[in-house]
Amino acid sequence: MGYGKTTAVSHALEGVETVRWYTGVEHLPDTSFYWFIQQLGNEDERTFRRMESISFLNRSNAAQAARILGDVRVERPVTLVFDNFQFAADNWPPQVIDALAKRAEDGLHLIFIAQNLGRLRPVFEAQEGGVCFLREKDLLLTQEDICGLARQGGMSLTRQQAKEVIRGTGGWPAAVSLSLAADGEVGEMD
């Protein structure tokens, strides 16, 4: 189900010069890490060649891959977005995520959009100082937000009506938008 994460990130990145997206798809083989290495090859040829030399990423070479990726240097700004990362997370060793989070700051920005980080959740949470998180509570709309959106759309909602919209939508922006487009009618969310 779409909760508005991708839309929120897409809007936030409007005007950013170089943004490249990878979208994971359920029930299809994950190629996100291979795509990531190819994108790095556009920015840091040396790292690309070093990663190519270790071939397919697995547990036996994850520490080596982490050391290589920790040395990545990107001069010009580039943002790589991994959408639906929950479909790829199991294929990314924790040491790789850790190395990427601890890299020296440069032009490389990584965004992982996921409904669930699975076994990588503790790895991401341990990086709290070096990783920016948008959690559910950061995306959910409040009654005041919903009343404000309704006013922008020329509607007038009472606090009770806004409460009903939250009850029916969970406060997720995409669902709230659809509800307001239907004059505040709400159905049950799956």
Predicted segments, located by residue:
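Sensor-1/coupling segment of RecA-like P-loop NTPase cores
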Residues: 87-92, 98-128, 133-135
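An amphipathic alpha-helix signature
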Residues: 30-37, 143-151
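Amphipathic alpha-helical "lid/sensor" segments that cap RecA-like P-loop NTPase cores
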Residues: 129-133, 148-190
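Conserved nucleotide-binding/hydrolysis micro-motifs of P-loop NTPases
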Residues: 2, 26-29, 116-120, 139
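Conserved phosphate-binding/catalytic loops and adjacent sensor/switch elements of nucleotide-binding enzymes
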Residues: 3, 8-74, 87
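Conserved P-loop NTPase "ATPase switch" module shared by AAA+ and STAND
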Residues: 68-93, 113
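Generic structural signal for small/hydrophobic residues in well-ordered secondary structure
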Residues: 36-38, 83, 113, 146, ...
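A short beta-strand-to-loop transition that corresponds to the Sensor-1 phosphate-sensing loop
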Residues: 1, 84, 112-117, 180
